[in-house]
A protein has these predicted regions:
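Flexible mid-to-C-terminal extensions adjoining Fe-S/redox cofactors in radical SAM and related proteins
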Residues: 175, 179-245
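Structural motif
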Residues: 12-14, 75, 238, 244-245
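Short, small/polar residue-rich loop motifs at catalytic or cofactor-binding pockets
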Residues: 160-164, 182
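Radical SAM enzyme [4Fe-4S]-AdoMet core and its adjacent flexible, acidic
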Residues: 24, 28, 36-38, 43, ...
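Conserved SAM/AdoMet-binding glycine-rich loop
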Residues: 1-37
Length: 245
């Protein structure tokens, strides 16, 4: 089960309601807030998200979180083409200006709106160059730390430990091994969280980390129903609209 004294709770969000809810969430025990930034340019970000004004609200929300003492960050998803266009560098500069503590970089996964991007499966060639590009920022105290899921899930770190040392909880209470996995293992509105977590973390495919990259981007792992549960977005529910974090 989860030891509340040895675990942390992170919120990854599009940032729409953070400014209004940050104080209440702090009282509830939330430790960290990460807002998704898809582009440093507000218009480009809002067009991608389909929500006018979202970029501005996300920045206001993260500034509110900073004022309340949260650990804060940007989460950015990079496709190979966005990386080549210099978007990561622009987002890092924005993060420096805002004053967040970290930029967490996800390499685009073949799920959600990218579920048709089969070119992202078993494609690691561009990731090392992107990871190494952050070294100057990480040596400069003026910048936030820049971390990469691709590094963490590699043989140089802990490997892909989704469902092993962490899980994702959807806005509707569904527990998944991570926010990119379609498969649901239970709902906290229907049974205790610890019970679902124990069931998930003792499955053979999740009882230990997988070295060498993310399960969702691995062709062999994706054959498992517990890793790639159909074609629906990982946020879709039969009784709820799809959401994008």
């Amino acid at each position: 089960s989860v030891d509340k004294d040895r675990s942390t709770t992170l919120l990854f969000t599009n940032g729409w309601a953070v400014e209004e809810q940050a104080k209440e969430l702090r009282r509830a025990g939330l430790d960290s807030v990460f807002v998704s930034i898809d582009a440093a340019d507000p218009q480009q970000h809002d067009e991608f998200r389909g929500t006018p004004g979202l970029h501005q609200r996300a920045l206001r929300g993260i500034q509110r979180a900073l004022s309340l003492g949260y650990s804060t960050g940007f989460s950015a998803t990079m496709t190979p083409e966005a990386w080549q266009a210099g978007e990561l560098q622009r987002i890092i500069e924005l993060a420096k200006g805002v004053g967040v503590h970290e930029v967490f970089v996800f390499d685009a996964m073949p799920t959600g709106r990218y579920k048709a991007r089969t070119d992202l499966v078993d494609n690691h060639d561009w990731l090392e160059e992107m990871i190494q590009s952050a070294a100057p920022y990480n040596r400069d105290d003026r910048y936030p730390g820049v971390t990469f899921l691709a590094y963490m899930s590699s043989h140089r770190s802990v490997g892909c430990s989704c469902g092993t040392s962490y899980f994702y909880l959807s806005p509707y209470g569904d527990m998944m091994s991570c926010d990119f996995n379609h498969a649901k293992f239970g709902n906290v509105l229907e049974e205790p969280l610890w019970q679902i977590w124990d069931r998930l973390s003792t499955l053979p495919e999740f009882c230990q980390a997988k070295w060498g990259g993310c399960k969702i981007k691995d062709a062999e792992s994706r054959k498992l129903q517990t890793v790639s549960d159909g074609d629906r977005s990982c946020h879709d529910r039969d009784d709820q609209p799809a959401m994008t974090n």
